[in-house]
Amino acid sequence: MSDVNKVVLAYSGGLDTSVILKWLQDTYQCEVVTFTADIGQGEELEPAREKARQFGVKEIYIDDLREEFVRDFVFPMFRANTVYEGEYLLGTSIARPLIAKRLIEIAQETNADAVSHGATGKGNDQVRFELGAYALNPNIKIIAPWREWDLLSREKLLAYAEKHGIPVEMKHRQGGSPYSMDANLLHISYEGRHLENPAAEAEEDMWRWTVSPERAPDEAEYLEIEYRNGDPISLNGKTLKPHELLAELNRLGGKHGIGRLDLVENRYVGMKSRGCYETPGGTILLKAHRAIESITLDREVAHLKDDLMPRYASMIYNGYWWSPERLALQALIDHTQQTVNGWVKLKLYKGNVIVTGRDSGTDSLFDPNIATFEDDAGAYDHRDAGGFIKLNALRLRIAANLRNKK
């Protein structure tokens, strides 16, 4: 294992990655560079710096990636109205390519010959991190401790930590959190423990970002989102940076019990997994984006996007953000968004996001003179519909005649 001289570790400062840090130093006899990403998880990150220093780490990166995360990853994904398996808004999946990108950049900056992560050998994240890393640097070495070591239980991790003087928070000594959680500006996820029984209802005190819809305010709240080229740029008339806008939508959505999801999903590695998610701001954005597209996109373009979306969602879920097919599809999606300009009004009420209005001063394809049920002064000739129907019925009539002859 002496071929590794320096490794960049995706480091949270928690129990798992702190054990990994020490394990890398001992097993590979290498220098470790730590990288901690701030993508809006809401945790204090400076303790990670202090922990890394305690292990003798000299190069410590703590990067605020919130703006880049929302601008270059979340918003491009939402231009496609992306949903995996009908429900999941891909909050964890979309964060991984950014972390992989920064790992590779830091490896280049520090002349490291390897990168490492704390994803387990059972999950999707190992695939996402590593596909991203190889796509950006095909010659990088990747160390995945969970696929190499024998510390496969919490008891073994704690024993290793105690043996090597790794600080352990009291919650871990007492059994740890009842859930495995992952958070960023788009969502927070919960897995493990009693959630592994898909028949068991999630406990109410699990949810952290949203109130129960039953306990949400009895009065609805209205908001208006302005779009430019498919991306939201302002909320209630105030222009905001992408990460600020999403954070405020998270606050508003959480207040009204919006964005809860209890899902059994198909992991890329082959198993089914139950997870619970809170995505309040993303749930609002999905509804708003579809609303502004409804009046600014040509019908066939909109339907084509809907046809392609599941494939696009799978690319992200499975870790192919940096693949040539995702980049090609993104170019098509972005082209369609040139006319997606205007505003959407929505009402938030007890877990529901209700569109109450939408308009575009520059790109609306809604023509009230044609769409009206009143006298349209000849804008639409009803007689044309007869020929349209006959031509579209031709193949149906031919098939019916054939059946009648049998």
Swiss-Prot record:
L-citrulline binds at Y88, S93, N124, R128, S180, S189, E265, Y277. InterPro entries: Arginosuc_syn_C, Arginosuc_syn_N, Arginosuc_synth, Arginosuc_synth_CS, Arginosuc_synth_type_1_subfam, AS_cat/multimer_dom_body, Rossmann-like_a/b/a_fold. Homotetramer. Its EC number is 6.3.4.5. HAMAP family: Arg_succ_synth_type1 (MF_00005). The lineage of its organism: Bacteria, Pseudomonadati, Pseudomonadota, Betaproteobacteria, Nitrosomonadales. Pathway: Amino-acid biosynthesis; L-arginine biosynthesis; L-arginine from L-ornithine and carbamoyl phosphate: step 2/3. One of its GO terms (cellular component) is cytoplasm. Keywords: Amino-acid biosynthesis, Arginine biosynthesis, ATP-binding, Cytoplasm, Ligase, Nucleotide-binding. It is found in: Cytoplasm. This is Argininosuccinate synthase. It comes from Methylobacillus flagellatus (strain ATCC 51484 / DSM 6875 / VKM B-1610 / KT). GO terms for molecular function: argininosuccinate synthase activity; ATP binding. ATP binds at A10, Y11, S12, G13, G14, L15, D16, T17, S18, A37, G118.
